[in-house]
Amino acid sequence: MSQLCPCGSAVEYSLCCQRYLSGNQLAPDPVQLMRSRYSAFVMKDADYLIKTWHSSCGVAQLRDDIIAGFAHTEWLGLTVFDHALTTDGKTGYVSFVARYSERGRAGAIIERSRFIKENGQWYYIDGTRPQFGRNDPCPCGSGKKFKKCCGQ
């Protein structure tokens, strides 16, 4: 029986993010890197997360913290709701909602991630957390107000 990819693509894992996590292929664009990094969180693959974080972020020394974070977090879903590339094609942005449960408490990360391309490979560099009003539509696309959805 095949397993769907945790990134939410509705494609089998073996045909989707597994090729990136295994190192057989590089993610071709920021959206695929975002999806594969989410899958790495679900699959508890600290090596892939560190490998795809830009070296200037100095996350290699945070390996133990990353692994410790896996123990109490269950990832529930990813929604990518916007993405863009700069005109030179060397910087990309991906806006997403990642839902999770930590120690039984629901949460969501809403971020506009920045990725850079160096030597043909995309890397996560940082992200910003956009602010939403409680009565704004939720960016996840549910049609609900933010306060009744990801803003809880």
From Swiss-Prot:
InterPro entries: NTF2-like_dom_sf (IPR032710), SEC_C_motif (IPR004027), UPF0225 (IPR023006), YchJ-like_M (IPR048469). Coiled coil: none annotated. SUPFAM superfamilies: NTF2-like, Sec-C motif. It comes from the Bacteria. NCBIfam families: PRK01617.1 (NF002449), PRK01752.1 (NF002486). PANTHER family: ADENYLATE CYCLASE-ASSOCIATED CAP C-TERMINAL DOMAIN-CONTAINING PROTEIN (PTHR33747:SF1), UPF0225 PROTEIN SCO1677 (PTHR33747). Belongs to the UPF0225 family. This is UPF0225 protein YchJ. It comes from Escherichia fergusonii (strain ATCC 35469 / DSM 13698 / CCUG 18766 / IAM 14443 / JCM 21226 / LMG 7866 / NBRC 102419 / NCTC 12128 / CDC 0568-73). The gene is ychJ.
